[in-house]
Amino acid sequence: MAFPRTLAILAAAAALVVACSHGGTPTGSSTTSGASPATPVAVPVPRSCAEPAGIPALLSPRDKLAQLLVVGVRDAADAQAVVTNYHVGGILIGSDTDLTIFDGALAEIVAGGGPLPLAVSVDEEGGRVSRLRSLIGGTGPSARELAQTRTVQQVRDLARDRGRQMRKLGITIDFAPVVDVTDAPDDTVIGDRSFGSDPATVTAYAGAYAQGLRDAGVLPVLKHFPGHGRGSGDSHNGGVTTPPLDDLVGDDLVPYRTLVTQAPVGVMVGHLQVPGLTGSEPASLSKAAVNLLRTGTGYGAPPFDGPVFSDDLSGMAAISDRFGVSEAVLRTLQAGADIALWVTTKEVPAVLDRLEQALRAGELPMSAVDRSVVRVATMKGPNPGCGR
């Protein structure tokens, strides 16, 4: 696949190239208040040059689990500590992140990371969800405005240009585009973040935006499966119920039938209760919801074997009102997600302890963890310097 090769080449240009046999300990394990403990608790491991299928055999159980975590960081010290101490698979640049991390520290952290390349992710949709506005030329138009005022090709070009700016900063994953279908007012939870109320329009414009990001070497992540557009509220504030699955199939799920085939691409599963699918559980913690995405059976899509992300598991009341972070992370991995996402680092050691306990107890099958590690390794591509 050409995309991981492009990603690896760009990463090599952005960071210090580390030979595959290098296993040195990254410097600077100090942390700001509330971050991971300063004392390293993970043994430094060499960067791996193995093919994705061979990666699980090279990692300890704890390092496998760590690769399935993406956590928000406050600043460079916070990022350095969680990568050095716990070998997490990725970090999230969020609304509270000190953007001076891009002044050189991020490249050093990436160069001194764990066994696989470090994923660096962001919510950069344009419009009102723009974490990097001060670094990439402002917020840009909202998705709704783009669909109303630009052609599909113009949207692809815009996403490519913004993606290139993100990639120069070191971003490898963008949690965009929004694929939700809605005509709700602009200022509602999805609102103008959506390309519109017509599934065909959303498919065309979201597909163009995703392709522009791919053109730039950034992985697009479609969200919020199986569809937040007609949900009963805001999952940041509490539980959200969508229309029944049969209703979603003819509307909200339509874009996914096409867009999951346009690889490489990821999908984020939302905290949405879907009558006829998830029962009282949110989709992000539901085996039935992830199985719907994986198999395509039930909504007319082909199987999907790309990376599946949870939505934020710590800062959204739809989850945090019911579960602590460790339990939520376990449940999303049990449901079949590959990557658990949340917005702070302080929970990482407890999460890894809980996941290791679940492995030993048979609550989380090692075979499922290994499959997710292979997907994560495929998503990331080879380490810089591996010659692939």
Curated annotation (Swiss-Prot):
What Pfam families is this protein classified in? Glyco_hydro_3
The subcellular location is: Cell inner membrane
Principal subcellular localization: membrane
* Species per Swiss-Prot/TrEMBL record: Mycobacterium tuberculosis (strain ATCC 25618 / H37Rv)
Which cellular component terms (GO) are annotated to the entry? Answer: cytosol; plasma membrane
| Pathway in which the depicted protein is active | Cell wall biogenesis; peptidoglycan recycling
Family as reported in the entry's similarity comment = Belongs to the glycosyl hydrolase 3 family.
Q: Give start-end of the signal peptide.
A: 1-19
- From the Swiss-Prot or TrEMBL record, give the protein name: Beta-hexosaminidase LpqI
Which reaction does this chain catalyze?
Hydrolysis of terminal non-reducing N-acetyl-D-hexosamine residues in N-acetyl-beta-D-hexosaminides
Q: What does this protein do?
A: Plays a role in peptidoglycan recycling by cleaving the terminal beta-1,4-linked N-acetylglucosamine (GlcNAc) from peptidoglycan fragments. Acts as a regulator for GlcNAc-MurNAc levels by cleaving disaccharides and allowing the breakdown of MurNAc.
Question: What is an annotated GO biological process for this record, any one?
Answer: cell wall organization
Name the residues that bind substrate: D123, R131, R193, K223, H224
Site (Important for catalytic activity) found at D234
| Highest rank taxon of the organism | Bacteria
Transmembrane parts of this sequence: none
